[in-house]
């Protein structure tokens, strides 16, 4: 719980920014941390009409044993609790996320029909098919079905770690290798965790046509983890109106990479277009310079 009585998950990594009437719930990625959404949360809060909530998913910001002890329904249950509390405080609530968090935002909308004002989907991850992914990765779903298959699979984060900004990439690499999981996330991901992602994605894909809320889908054409196929799939199958925008000069982690200001600008505009509350346009050129460290407050 934070000072506002909102459940932000385990530990102290989750945060709330802003004090506006529109609520925005952002969900971090698999093996990730709330920190990867801090820059976007700060930018949206500066718009003046938003309060942004970023919880920690169950099993995250610890070690792999913590993560393996949880499944996708545990991750969702924490998000559900936060969403219910945020909805009690705000007439309009937008939900979004990065990577797996974008997929989970769709699940939230499907579980709470008529209660989500819109979706903010960053680098949606329905399958790992980016240019840095091993070409045999397509076999992973098959291995997940073989007895003990999940126990022989292990995936390690490798350069460029979803980040084109070389300075930031070096900082993230150091933090991951030094075990600073609450800042940069985990360096490895076990097969059990990957299986949970596949299970959640299968459920969400079936529900997508029934999700009628408007969605902003942002994806990099240079994404090293998940190709634009993922954004195209959302555009084709989501039941509501989709605004898909492809970014250049960044990799998978678009919320912290070289185009994060563009992500803020597009997100703020989308929220303003789909809310009953209006505010002055956010000045994304003001404030902090390009993110120098994932510890940026």
Protein language model features and the residues they cover:
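Short, surface-exposed "cap/lid" segments of acyl-processing enzymes
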Residues: 6-63
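Catalytic nucleophile-loop/oxyanion-hole region of alpha/beta-hydrolase
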Residues: 63-94
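Alpha/beta-hydrolase-fold enzymes
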Residues: 100, 111-187
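Short beta-strand/loop motif that positions the catalytic acidic residue
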Residues: 211, 217-219, 223
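Conserved alpha/beta-hydrolase "acid-adjacent" motif
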Residues: 224-230
């Amino acid at each position: 719980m934070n000072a506002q009585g909102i459940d932000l998950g385990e530990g102290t990594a989750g945060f709330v920014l802003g004090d506006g009437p529109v609520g925005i719930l952002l969900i971090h990625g698999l093996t990730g941390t709330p920190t990867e959404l801090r820059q976007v949360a700060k930018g949206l809060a500066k718009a003046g009409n938003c309060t942004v909530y970023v919880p920690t998913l169950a099993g995250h910001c610890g070690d792999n044993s913590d993560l393996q002890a949880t499944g996708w329904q545990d991750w969702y249950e924490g998000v559900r609790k936060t969403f219910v509390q945020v909805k009690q405080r705000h007439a309009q609530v937008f939900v979004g996320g990065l990577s797996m968090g974008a997929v989970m935002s769709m699940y939230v909308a499907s579980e709470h029909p008529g209660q989500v004002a819109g979706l903010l989907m960053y680098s949606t991850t329905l399958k790992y098919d980016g240019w840095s992914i091993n070409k045999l990765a397509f076999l992973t779903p098959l291995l997940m079905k073989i007895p003990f298959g999940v126990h022989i699979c292990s995936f390690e984060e490798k350069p460029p770690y979803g980040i084109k900004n070389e300075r930031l990439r070096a900082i993230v690499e150091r933090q991951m290798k030094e075990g600073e999981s609450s800042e940069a996330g985990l360096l490895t991901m076990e097969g059990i965790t990957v299986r949970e992602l596949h299970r959640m994605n299968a459920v969400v894909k079936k529900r997508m046509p029934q999700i009628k809320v408007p969605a902003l889908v942002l994806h990099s054409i240079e994404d090293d983890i998940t190709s634009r196929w993922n954004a195209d799939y959302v555009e084709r199958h989501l039941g509501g109106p989709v605004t898909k925008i492809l970014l250049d000069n960044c990799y998978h982690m678009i919320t912290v990479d070289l185009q994060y200001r563009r992500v803020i600008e597009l997100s703020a505009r989308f929220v303003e277009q789909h809310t009953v509350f209006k505010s002055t346009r956010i000045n994304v050129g003001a404030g902090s310079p390009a993110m120098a460290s994932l510890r940026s407050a």
